[in-house]
Design a protein with these regions (language model features):
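Extreme N-terminal leader/targeting regions
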Residues: 1-56, 166-167, 172
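Charged, glycine-enriched surface loops/patches
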Residues: 167-193
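A short, structured surface patch at a secondary-structure boundary
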Residues: 13-15, 24, 50-172, 182
Length: 193
């Protein structure tokens, strides 16, 4: 039983991944009552966000993982963030995610990192940073989006540090999340924590 996500498998190898963005964070899950009270504020806030950006701001972010050649129903991409497989190029700014990719022998897909070589825990990627085959593309609010475009990044895996862990951090972290959602959506690069 997973604490942070749910997986649903469908025909043709399509998978829906639902990620809970409230567990172990200061973000509060919406309830029916709070939804009614905050409807006007949220409506004003959501008018600033467009399409995919809104999907990243919800309590649950839904990713539809689509194998090469599979076709999804028209309009479904308005309700989910589509990740097309195979992913050939990834930006990783999470040490935990990087270690998992290393154990799965998938670090060859990493073309940009959100950590400098002295912070990188994977030897092959430290060497790749040194020889220039992997780019340091900044981290968190200092991400170099031009470097991500140049590396033809197909997905960004961010640290959960982008989410607030204490009540005092909530507004600043929500603004960082909103800014990231806007920029990644503009570049059409799906991101997850």
């Amino acid at each position: 039983h997973a604490k942070y996500f749910k997986l649903y498998h469908y025909a043709k190898g399509i998978t829906l991944l639902e990620v809970d963005m409230t567990t172990d964070t200061a973000r509060k899950p919406e309830t029916v009552d709070s939804g009614k009270e905050n409807a006007k504020t949220e409506a004003a806030d959501s008018q600033e966000l467009t399409g995919t950006e809104k999907l990243y701001m919800g309590n649950v972010v839904k990713y539809l993982i689509v194998p090469e050649g599979a076709v999804i129903p028209a309009g479904l991409d308005k309700d989910v963030i589509v990740i097309n497989q195979p992913v050939e190029s990834a930006y990783v700014a999470s040490t935990d995610a990087l270690n998992i990719l290393d154990k799965l022998d998938l670090t060859d897909k990493v073309t940009a990192l959100g950590m400098e070589k002295e912070d990188c825990t994977v030897d092959s990627l430290t060497a790749a940073l040194e020889d220039g085959s992997v780019t340091f593309a900044g981290k968190d609010e200092d991400t170099d989006y031009k470097a991500l475009v140049k590396s033809q990044c197909g997905i960004s895996i961010l640290s959960s540090d982008i989410l607030p862990t204490e009540e005092a951090d909530t507004e600043a972290k929500e603004n960082l999340l909103k800014d990231s959602a806007e920029k990644y959506s503009t570049l059409k690069i799906p991101f997850c924590r």
